[in-house]
A protein has these predicted regions:
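Conserved beta-strand-loop-alpha-helix hinge in the C-terminal portion
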Residues: 222-249
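Conserved ABC ATPase signature
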Residues: 142-146, 150
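The feature captures the beta-strand-to-loop junction immediately N-terminal to the Walker
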Residues: 37-39, 332-334
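H-loop/switch region of ABC-family ATPase nucleotide-binding domains
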Residues: 202-203
Length: 343
């Protein structure tokens, strides 16, 4: 028996006619890293909630088929018991954090305390996960004083501290900057190597292609495919299904570069190998055209010597200077850099 089995799973929310999940079947083993993709409304979040018993125990409705986790039926096992095996991380950390604790340390320890984990073990687990997710320096801060990305890492740490055997992540990097996203993917990959089964719902196809062992493709509640990233992203119908493949794959489609098995590469390393095999291919880099710079427009927005801090010991802006004209301007920076505060 596989560690997780989904057999002909069907589900319809109350007061609706359309199935949110329509005959889903697949298996997963310990330590597999599986991505779940599909356009909005495909059933991704509903499926993840079925893994941990929220569907149908909390979200009522018409339920059929079976989800089994290590021999335990997810639909009938109390969620309080099932959460020891299956951890779910929401897209929005506001929906995950308890609000009952004033510090990051206490928030991450909250679930462990509820299950009566000894204090010594709690300290060991918290030391581990807070360093893993690079939030050790925030351990004495209130979680709701952190940026969105930092809060998400606290939410992830709270679940990881429970040491689940299956980890479900519902777009966990949606509020993280590129560096934070890479850290989360790398951390989750390491967790998979320790034997934790990972299911990650994501829109960042490049990341999924690089990290996942398999990908589950859903469309309008139906299972379209369950296969390797190379085979999934080589499908000719992805655009019709609302999926944009990784840039590397799109490039290889244009250049007619293939892997030995006939699929398109999804990683840069595979592209290099494909280029070596295709001696006739000629790859040309785009040339920068001569650009005539127009005279800079007049400034319409000026910031001079801006100073601001939420607390006395943590300034957000210190002698900040900025001049803008009518041209569009992007504001970028790591989580906590001050982007939202400036806005």
């Amino acid at each position: 028996m596989a560690f997780l089995e989904v057999e002909h799973l069907k589900y319809r929310y109350p007061y609706t006619k359309k199935l949110a999940l329509d005959d889903i079947s697949f298996t997963a083993e310990k330590g597999e890293f599986i991505g779940i993709i599909g356009e909005n409304g495909a059933g991704k979040s509903t499926l993840s909630q079925a893994f941990c018993g929220l569907v149908p125990q909390f979200y009522k409705g018409a339920y059929g088929g079976k989800v089994t986790v290590d021999g335990i039926a997810a639909a009938t096992t109390p969620t309080a018991e099932l959460c020891k095996k299956v951890g779910l991380i929401f897209q929005n950390p506001f929906n995950q954090l308890s609000g009952a604790k004033d510090t990051v340390w206490d928030e991450v320890a909250f679930g462990l305390e509820n299950f009566g984990v000894p204090a010594e073990q709690i300290h060991e687990r918290l030391n581990k996960v807070l360093h893993q997710l690079d939030i050790w320096q925030f351990r004495e801060k209130n979680p709701f004083d952190l940026s969105g990305g930092q809060m998400q890492r606290v939410a992830i740490a709270s679940v990881l501290a429970m040491e689940p055997e299956i980890l479900l992540l519902d777009e966990p990097t949606s509020q993280l900057d590129p560096q934070g996203s890479e850290e989360v993917f790398h951390t989750v990959e390491l967790l998979a190597q320790t034997g934790i089964t990972i299911f990650m719902i994501e829109q960042k196809m490049e990341k999924l292609a690089s990290y996942c062992d398999k990908i589950l493709l859903l469309h309008e509640g139906k299972q379209i495919a369950f296969d390797t990233p190379e085979k999934i992203f080589s499908r000719p119908d992805l655009a019709e299904l609302g999926i944009c493949p990784p840039y590397v794959t799109r490039y290889c489609v244009e250049q007619h570069l293939f892997r030995p098995d006939g699929t398109y590469p999804v990683a840069v390393e595979d592209v290099k190998e494909a280029l070596k095999r295709d001696k006739e291919s000629k790859v040309t880099l785009p040339q920068l055209a001569d650009t005539v710079l127009a005279e800079a427009p007049e400034n319409r927005f000026d910031v001079r010597n801006l100073k601001f801090s939420y607390t006395e010991d943590h300034p957000i802006f210190e002698n900040f200077q900025l001049s803008l004209d009518q041209r569009p301007t992007a504001i970028i920076g790591q989580n906590g850099a001050g982007k939202t505060t400036l806005d």
